[in-house]
Amino acid sequence: MAKKRIVIALGHNALGTNLPEQKAAIGPTAQIIADFIQTGWQVAVVHSNAPQVGMIHTAMNELCQNHPEEGYTPAPMSVCSAMSQGYIGYDLQNGIRSALLKRGIYKSVSTILTQVTADPYDESFYHPVKKVGRVMTAEEARLQEARGNHVAEIPGKGFQRIVSAPKPVAIVEIDAIRALLDADQIVISCGGGGIPVLEQGLDL
């Protein structure tokens, strides 16, 4: 008889907004996930990454600003999202694995770096609204706009970068995710809804 499958979604701020908060949140979260696995469920875990992407984006920008002599360039939002999927998955993998081993359960836990295709005509590309990164001064906002980035004013606070959040059309790595679930492994994927990509011939 096939096992029941469940998707556990860790929503906005469920893993905190910085590294210590994430570490603290992983423990009880992993225990809940282990409860489902122990009772016979196959589990796929998805998670938000908005605070983490903002933190990485800010850090990469400040690295460029503080060390111009090194020739660093700002990291695209897609790269920041990929980095966040990696380190969130790393913490979740280890937390879930530990929770299972303490119960005598031996299962592989894997993170899939996940991309999702998007419609090039999605409204979000033309009218971005998702806020990321720290609040900026007016001068910093002007510099961001000069680089081609979109910025919105936050009343009473300052300015913040805004990015597109298109609706996913398809998961690029869906076959890998299904293969791992079919092998009775725990899968962590679709961090932040997946990294939006556009199909351009054979390239993404």
Located regions from the model:
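Short, basic, glycine/proline-bearing loop/turn elements
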Residues: 13-20, 156-164, 199-204
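Ligand-binding beta-strand-loop-alpha-helix segment within the catalytic cores
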Residues: 63-187
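N-terminal glycine-/serine-/threonine-rich phosphate-binding loop
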Residues: 1-46, 55-67, 179-184
